[in-house]
């Protein structure tokens, strides 16, 4: 059995021991329902209020502007569905990009198909970025919401969110950014650097627990709720709050965002070593941009190879990587990001390596030692399957 090399930090990260320790009292002793009026409930409510105040202080917002969610997917759903529905009397035109996470794209698909909204999906350049000029040309009198992710989960492109947000604000249009992949990977001062009205955050992307996220909602915006059953989270998100996970989220924010845990010389050097070596490999084409990109992410395609064969080959050698695409019933869907880059023939062959704080130079060299053979096997298996 080969040793395990984890190069999939954009998918999830291990829970940090200090974060786990901060969560433990909420699992063992302070386990009351924050909505209960008795002493155990009041203890839990005090912890919830303190966690919200800590998050707001760290992010640079008001506590009332922080809504705790079950993760990035719910935060995106609340931001997009809730805001579009709340503002539909003003207009039903929405703008997003062609390279959003499925948690965003599928919200826009639903609003378009089921609720009569018009959706403009902005193209991207060869580096996967949206042009501010394209956004400005897409504005209409009935545009009420723009949503563009801060950083792409598949290829690591960093969007010009501050400029996009400024363009929206100049027109009085609400701007949401999915910052799930951004936090922990790029320098952070406060939320104002996004020029956004709504910002999605997810704990397990920076050594926090799964099942915890938040949505910043700039006052006085009030999206319609998408969950019903109580007045929790200022009547914006029904359901008993997951207090241990919330405390873990806030602790991870405080420990790993400033300075960002992934934004280190070591990680950038390891990323650059991978980039230089993969660029020289036969059959590989890099698709992750080298400028304005996440410091830990390397993405490439192998035209003519099957993505599942590539991932299976890596896994057999103990290497945990990702296609960046949804996997269903043993087959990979084409990467929408690679399709948006105009590389249709290679959209099924994306491989993403995403590094983290425990990645080492030895890991990188071990991967590079076996990668050419894995690529060769994947190409040969594709040719064999096609009868060539």
Predicted regions and their residues:
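Pyridoxal 5′-phosphate
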Residues: 1-388
């Amino acid at each position: 059995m080969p040793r395990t090399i984890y190069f999939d930090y954009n998918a999830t990260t291990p829970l940090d021991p200090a974060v786990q320790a901060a969560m433990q009292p909420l699992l063992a002793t302070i386990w009351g329902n924050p909505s209960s009026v008795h002493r155990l409930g009041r203890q839990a409510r005090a912890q919830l209020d303190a966690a919200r105040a800590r998050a707001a202080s760290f992010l640079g917002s008001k506590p009332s502007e922080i809504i705790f969610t079950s993760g990035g997917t719910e935060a995106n759903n609340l931001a997009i569905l809730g805001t579009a529905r709340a503002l539909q009397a003003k207009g039903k035109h929405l703008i997003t990009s062609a390279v959003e996470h499925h948690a965003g794209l599928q919200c826009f698909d639903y609003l378009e198909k089921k609720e009569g909204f018009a959706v403009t999906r902005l193209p991207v350049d060869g580096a996967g970025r949206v042009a501010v000029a394209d956004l400005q040309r897409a504005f209409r009198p009935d545009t009420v919401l723009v949503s563009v992710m801060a950083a792409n989960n598949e290829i690591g492109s960093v969007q010009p969110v501050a400029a996009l947000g400024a363009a929206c604000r100049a027109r009085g249009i609400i701007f949401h950014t999915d910052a799930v992949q951004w936090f922990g990977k790029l320098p952070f001062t406060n939320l104002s650097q996004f020029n956004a009205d709504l910002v999605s955050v997810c704990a397990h992307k920076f050594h926090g627990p799964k099942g915890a996220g938040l949505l910043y909602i700039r006052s006085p915006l009030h999206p319609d709720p998408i969950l019903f059953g109580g007045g929790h989270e200022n009547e914006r998100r029904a359901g008993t709050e997951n207090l241990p996970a919330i405390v873990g989220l806030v602790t991870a924010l405080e420990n790993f965002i400033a300075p960002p845990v992934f934004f280190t010389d070591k990680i950038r050097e390891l990323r650059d070593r991978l980039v230089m070596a993969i660029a020289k490999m036969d059959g590989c084409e890099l698709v992750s941009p080298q400028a304005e990109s996440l410091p830990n992410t390397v993405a490439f395609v192998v035209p003519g190879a099957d993505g599942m064969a590539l991932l299976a080959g890596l896994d057999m050698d103990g290497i945990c990587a990702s296609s960046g695409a949804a996997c269903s019933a043993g087959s990979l869907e084409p990467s929408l990001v690679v399709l948006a880059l105009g590389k249709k023939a290679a959209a099924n062959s994306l491989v993403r390596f995403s590094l983290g704080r425990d990645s080492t130079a030895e890991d990188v060299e071990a991967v590079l030692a076996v990668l050419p053979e894995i690529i060769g096997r994947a190409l040969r298996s594709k040719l064999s399957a096609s009868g060539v």
